[in-house]
Amino acid sequence: MIQGTGSSVGKSLLVAGVSRALTRRGLVVRPFKPQNMSNNAAIAADGGEIGRAQALQARACRISPSHHMNPVLLKPQSEIGAQIVVQGKVHGQATARAYQAMKPQLLGTVLESFGILRKQADIVLVEGAGSASEINLRAGDIANMGFARAANVPVVIAGDIDRGGVIAALVGTKTVLDPDDAAMVRGFLVNRMRGDPSLFAEGMRLIEQQTGWEALGLVPHCEAARALPAEDAADLLRGLSAPTRSGNTVIAVPMLPHIANFDDLDPLAAEDSVTLVMVPPGQPLPVADAIIIPGSKTVIADLAALRHHGWDIDILAHRRRGRSIIGLCGGYQMLGRAIHDPQGFEGPAGSAAGLGLLEIETVLEPHKILTSRSGHLFNHDVPVSGYEMHMGITTGSGLRRPLLSLGPDAPEGCVSADGVVMGTYLHGLFHGGAFRRHLLATLDVSSHGGDHEDAVEHALDALADHMEAHVAIDRLLALSA
């Protein structure tokens, strides 16, 4: 089990890289994360939803994702509360305090999923959550040491040298851990080294000396990993998602507080001809060729935030200039005339006026639609594929002008009368090269990007090569025996 000294130290990519490396060696590997907190979710092949990081790790193992790989998924809806997804299905909502009381009841479910995966595999690579040293949350823990001890899984602690203070982070983790928890730790990894690794040889020795843990690798920064999807919205602001480009075509994206499934944007960010601008709160949307309003976990609250930051004014000005606007899932709902949440599924019950750019209205309902879809651009021979993941029924006269056709008598999405404003529930739309080329052609630019899925595969193989070179994988296998 790879735990971390903190959030965003690279646990997800370490697991993905080692998973691909072991899979290439001929082992049957399964990824597992007992508890994840993310609004970036994926549809599991056996139903329900899991964190997209675990879906990527499953891909690294060359298998379809299962809801057992992430049995507890927390999808933040406010500063103090989240939607709780258990084994792929929505379990309810809870404040952070209420969830702390609920965790011991979920341990059995977590162990059940882990047991199912363990029976399928030669090795299960487990990823912890956040920091292993948050001892204030240790009681009832199911994400880190609580799980490790319950499942009797050896632990490796990962630290991030790029952010500084990695010696203190690792030694400090050993210091604050309960002795029985510390006894589960077999070694450590130092991740994201930049420059000459030999300059930190003494640091590795000091960590070994101070902790008694075995050094299992000093892992340099891996540039190839930038082609892989970011897990956390904060990574977007830190520039850790898709490669930065400086193309002439500017696409602006407002960073909604509860932005969801933002890996929709990765293929556009990888285009040489495109500059994808993620606009943080407090900054105006720049003059752009297109604006994409992304998915959202709390649509009414994020629509209010969009107005608070003045982005609605920027979007309406962009519309008057006759430039393209695309809404994805929650962003699609925001483009309509109104959004209604009569039962308070995403927050306080009520309604909100939309941006009024599409002739639709949406009512949020308890049933969550989770399905993979494929078809083509309406009235065009342009194939599309992706998935839907939303709560809400959309109606209105605008639906007479659908964006997509997803089967016989299955129109989907909406387009304004002049074709400038578009909305859809289909995530993953830009991953298809044909639709991406079509979209960029409407912006008078050619697509120079290759197949995005091929790029992800190449990045996973490059990451596996990186792990083979810098991680003591044979020692990891010995620890798991």
UniProtKB/Swiss-Prot annotation:
Pfam families: CbiA, GATase_3. The active site is at C329, H427. GO terms for molecular function: ABC-type vitamin B12 transporter activity; catalytic activity. It comes from the Bacteria. InterPro entries: Class_I_gatase-like, CobQ/CobB/MinD/ParA_Nub-bd_dom, CobQ_GATase1, CobQ_N, CobQ_synth, GATase_3, P-loop_NTPase. GO terms for biological process: cobalamin biosynthetic process. Residues 248-435 form the GATase cobBQ-type domain. Pathway: Cofactor biosynthesis; adenosylcobalamin biosynthesis. Keywords: Cobalamin biosynthesis, Glutamine amidotransferase. PROSITE patterns: GATASE_COBBQ (PS51274). HAMAP family: CobQ. Belongs to the CobB/CobQ family. CobQ subfamily. PANTHER family: COBYRIC ACID SYNTHASE, DETHIOBIOTIN SYNTHETASE. Catalyzes amidations at positions B, D, E, and G on adenosylcobyrinic A,C-diamide. NH(2) groups are provided by glutamine, and one molecule of ATP is hydrogenolyzed for each amidation. This is Cobyric acid synthase. It comes from Granulibacter bethesdensis (strain ATCC BAA-1260 / CGDNIH1). The gene is cobQ.
